[in-house]
Swiss-Prot record:
Its EC number is 1.3.99.-. Induction: Repressed by FadR in the absence of LCFAs (fatty acids of 14-20 carbon atoms). When LCFAs are present in the medium, they are converted to long-chain acyl-CoAs, which antagonize FadR as to its binding to fadR boxes on target DNA and thus derepress transcription. It catalyses: a 2,3-saturated acyl-CoA + A = a 2,3-dehydroacyl-CoA + AH2. Keywords: FAD, Fatty acid metabolism, Flavoprotein, Lipid degradation, Lipid metabolism, Oxidoreductase. Pfam families: Acyl-CoA_dh_1, Acyl-CoA_dh_M, Acyl-CoA_dh_N. This is Acyl-CoA dehydrogenase. It is an enzyme of class 1 (oxidoreductase). PANTHER family: ACYL-COA DEHYDROGENASE. GO terms for biological process: fatty acid beta-oxidation. Belongs to the acyl-CoA dehydrogenase family. Involved in the degradation of long-chain fatty acids. The gene is acdA. Pathway: Lipid metabolism; fatty acid beta-oxidation. InterPro entries: Acyl-CoA_DH_CS, Acyl-CoA_Oxase/DH_mid-dom, Acyl-CoA_Oxase/DH_mid-dom_sf, AcylCo_DH-like_C, AcylCo_DH/oxidase_C, AcylCoA_DH/ox_N, AcylCoA_DH/ox_N_sf, AcylCoA_DH/oxidase_NM_dom_sf.
């Protein structure tokens, strides 16, 4: 068993780390304060090939793998969790289902644009009345001739309002419940598609989260993803990989908080020596580092399994569960190490703490992860 990263993975880590340090970090606090999405940053990520990391060159990607992708999300999230989740949602939630379930025509048209970063992607599953219970959605799609007509709404859409392409799930046969859900590719310019309110959030504030609405939205049948009734399966398989993207985001947030806390602890003097030398602080730092490393290993393992074509659903759920809890614990401890300064916006740890909370909620709450894991253990 080899735990070393390949030369390619190390090269991608350095590339993204340098980009994050010089292009993302300088404006992270300002974008958070202003709740501002920076499309130019997305273009710069595209120019570096980050928007197509795991996809074949035939579809505009760079032909790497899912481990390279989670490394990129981790490095971005160390300085800005909003930028990390922008890439995660774009690749895991929009591009992946197209790659896995799209026709050749759909992949050539849409996956290529997404991989090249010419278009931004999003995923629309959650509704106001169906969060964890995705099978109870109310959005409908009625087949009329060569089109489907969608009616309903979705909430908490990452990249909402800035995305060009949405993977949308709607009910085509209410009698079949989960087996009556179908997936569609919806472009932002389709007639009857609207962006609703933008959420005011605790964290990841420069990542837009919006409602989207369908009012007799006409979607050509050629834009159906998979067969009728396969939507729920597509959604669940998509979330298997998406969870590991969020785990990578959580690891990045936690590492960023630890780096800041460690530097501060070395510089801050109390009672004649740095607080890093005080056992109470030193032990906190040791625990934080250990939790992060364990979470990182789980995340990389899940990515390796997916890249190797092996079952990865359980590993992905475990990585998100562990990394989400780690991010919340580590960022809270980082604020504590900073003391009163940690509670101010003069330092980034309060932002890390606010950003960490969402990793325990979206793409399946911690409770849902435990449910997924326990069911797989019982099989």
């Amino acid at each position: 068993m080899n735990f070393s990263l390949s030369e390619e993975h190390e090269m991608i880590r350095k590339l993204v780390r340098d980009f994050a340090k010089h292009e993302v970090a300088p404006t992270a606090a300002e974008r958070d304060e202003q709740e501002r999405f920076d499309r130019e940053l997305f273009r710069e990520m595209a120019n570096l090939g980050l928007t197509g990391i795991p996809w074949p060159e035939d579809y505009g990607g760079i032909g790497s793998d899912y481990l390279a992708y989670v490394i990129a999300v981790e490095e971005l999230s160390k300085v800005c969790a909003s930028t990390g989740v922008t890439l995660s949602a774009h690749i895991s939630l929009c591009s992946w289902p197209l790659f896995a379930f799209g026709t050749e025509e759909q992949k050539t048209e849409y996956l290529t644009q997404l991989a090249l970063g010419e278009k931004i992607g999003a995923f629309a599953l959650t509704e106001a009345g169906s969060g964890s219970d995705a099978g109870s959605m109310k959005t409908t799609a009625e087949r009329i001739g060569d089109d489907y007509v969608l009616n309903g709404s979705k909430v908490f859409i990452t990249n909402g309002g800035v995305a060009d392409i949405y993977i949308v799930f709607a009910v085509t046969d209410p009698e079949k419940k989960k087996k009556g859900v179908t997936a569609f590719i919806v472009e932002k310019d389709f007639e009857g598609f609207f962006t609703g309110k933008k959420e005011k959030k605790l964290g990841i504030r420069s990542s837009p989260t919006t409602e989207i609405m369908f009012e007799d939205c006409v979607v050509p049948a050629s834009k159906r993803l998979g067969e009728e009734g396969e939507g729920f399966k597509i959604a669940m398989k998509t979330l298997d990989g998406g969870r590991n993207g969020i785990a990578a985001q959580a690891v990045g947030i936690a590492q960023g908080a630890l780096d800041a806390a460690l530097q501060y602890a070395k510089e801050r003097k109390q009672f004649g020596k740095s607080i890093a030398e005080q056992q109470g602080i030193a032990f906190k730092l040791a625990d934080m580092a250990t939790m992060i490393e364990a979470s990182r290993l789980l995340t990389y393992q899940a990515a390796w399994l997916e890249s190797s074509g092996l079952p990865y659903g359980k590993a992905s759920a475990m990585s998100k569960l562990m990394a989400g809890d780690t991010a919340m614990k580590v960022t809270t401890e980082a604020v504590q190490i900073f003391g009163g300064y940690g509670y101010t916006k003069d330092y980034p740890v309060e932002r890390y703490m606010r950003d960490a909370k969402i990793t325990q909620i979206y793409e399946g709450t911690q409770e849902i992860q435990r449910l997924v894991i326990s069911r797989m253990l019982a099989d």
